[in-house]
Curated annotation (Swiss-Prot):
InterPro entries: TMEM231
The protein's name in its UniProt record: Transmembrane protein 231
Record flagged with keyword Acetylation: no
Gene that encodes it: Tmem231
Organism: Mus musculus (Mouse)
Coiled coil: none
Family, per entry: Belongs to the TMEM231 family.
Length: 315
């Protein structure tokens, strides 16, 4: 009579031995070699603990309408004109003070509630005998980040240009870029640099000196800089015409560096560990099957229906 395959169920083969046997010692050794070396490999390959991460964010930047201008005149080496929005600075300039006409506007081009660009124009009246050879200009901004930690600071854009021939206009078109010497925190409120770049209440001339202002600003770990201003110097000024500065300053999306939190570090380390562990699990599983099937270490093989081994452990 012909026979047909009617039913089947899997059988698991268990190997039994005493706790003090060579088989138990072998299993303990292979378990240690399975789980510990992947940890060492991941750690020694560098980058196991994520110490710095980054993300993109559009900063919330607003022009504070604070300006400090120094226009270098020629041909006399010490000739200059100066003006700022700080009354004390203006009083200190004496005969060098010259009040310009200033206009500015900011635009939110993509209507996301954050300004994207500043259009700044300054017209400095000049005498027919006065000729501008160089410009030093400071504009201050309020700079905020909110996606990870809340970071607030008052920053500046510093522009300095000088040329060999007198000019009539200066065109500047650049980006206000963030510069970090250290990463930000991943949470909390950071207002350590939310102080005025220029101490407008100080009665001392040193606090308005450009060298002092720039040096103090560069001591910060987080600053902004006017990147790629691409200055265009136009010559040929009419006798009664003012010297004009046109500036277009964009506020681009930034890549922010920050210190990751504990759970982000664990997640990053866990991914590296598991990816290496899977290889070790596969290799040592084959080694254990070979050793026990070929009785390299003495054990008692027992055929057990699938699931019975788990029931024994539970009982």
């Amino acid at each position: 009579m012909a026979l047909y395959h009617l039913f089947s169920h899997p059988i698991e083969r268990a190997y039994r031995a005493g706790l003090c046997s060579k088989a138990a010692l072998f299993l303990l050794l292979t378990t240690a070699l399975t789980y510990i070396p992947p940890l060492l490999v991941a750690f020694r390959s560098h980058g196991f603990w994520l110490k710095r991460s980054s993300y993109e964010e559009q900063p919330n930047v607003r022009f504070q309408h604070q300006v400090l201008l120094v226009a270098l005149l020629g041909p006399e080496p010490e000739a200059f004109l100066a003006w700022s929005t700080f009354p004390t600075f203006n009083r200190l300039q004496g005969a060098h003070l010259r009040v310009p006409l200033v206009s500015s506007r900011e635009e939110d081009r993509n209507q996301d509630g954050k300004m994207d660009v500043l259009y700044f124009k300054l017209e400095l009246p000049l005498q027919p005998t006065e000729h501008v050879l160089g410009v030093q200009l400071i504009l201050t901004f309020s700079y905020q980040l909110h996606r990870m930690s809340t970071f607030e600071m008052q920053s500046m854009a510093f522009l300095q240009s000088s040329f060999a021939v007198p000019g009539s206009q200066l065109y500047v078109n650049g980006d206000l870029r963030l510069q970090q010497k250290q990463p930000l925190s991943y949470r909390g409120l950071d207002i350590r640099y939310n102080v005025s770049v220029i101490n407008g209440t100080s009665p001392f001339a040193q606090d308005y000196d450009l060298t002092h202002i720039v040096a103090a600003y560069q001591e910060r770990n987080v600053t902004t800089v006017l990147s790629d201003p691409n200055p265009i110097w136009l010559v040929g000024r009419a006798a009664e015409a003012p010297f004009v500065i046109h500036a277009v300053i964009r506020y681009p999306t930034e890549v922010i560096s920050y210190q990751p939190g504990f759970w982000e570090m664990i997640k990053f380390a866990w991914i590296q560990y598991v990816s290496i562990l899977l290889i070790f699990l596969w290799v040592f599983e084959r080694i254990k099957i070979f050793v026990f099937q070929n009785q390299v270490v003495t054990s008692i093989p027992v055929a057990v229906p699938q699931g019975e081994i788990r029931k024994e452990h539970l009982s």
